Amino acid sequence: MSPSPIHSITFGRAAPGLAVRDIQAAFRFYSEILGMQKVFENGSPVGFMVLKKDAAEIHLSQSRDHAPSTVNAFHMFVDDIDALYAICEAAGVRIIKSLKDKDYGQRAFVFADPDGNRIDVGQRI
């Protein structure tokens, strides 16, 4: 059996896509809480938006009948997990799993956005 050509392909950064019921409300949340900036939007009215901060990117898609999942939508790394946790707590963000050191070498917590999308945030320790 010959090796698959997949082994010669290098993968880069992945950008998660999130369904949201109100794309403008989601934009306000991600910009105010996480400091993300809108770098692209499409549609009239807007139905798709790309948000970015540093190397992190989130793609939002309008879906009025979105039902939140019970699993994490994605994981992202930050360089000051304690500061982000404090920002989330002060803003009244719904914390799903509180901040703690994990046995897999990360300090992490999970929060939910206004649409119930669960975001896992970690920092390597």
Q: For the regions a protein language model found, what residue spans apply to each?
A:
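N-terminal beta-strand motif that seeds the catalytic metal site of vicinal oxygen chelate
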Residues: M1-A25, N72-F74, G122-I125
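Core segments of cupin and vicinal oxygen chelate
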Residues: F11, G17-E57
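Vicinal oxygen chelate
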Residues: R13-R21, M49-K52, S63-A91, R107-A112
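Conserved active-site tyrosine of GNAT-family acetyltransferases
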Residues: A26, Y30-S31, C88, D113-G116
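Short loop/turn motifs at secondary-structure junctions and domain boundaries
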Residues: E41-N42, K100-D103
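Short, ordered coil/turn segments that flank beta-strands lining enzyme active or ligand-binding pockets
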Residues: A56, D103, P114
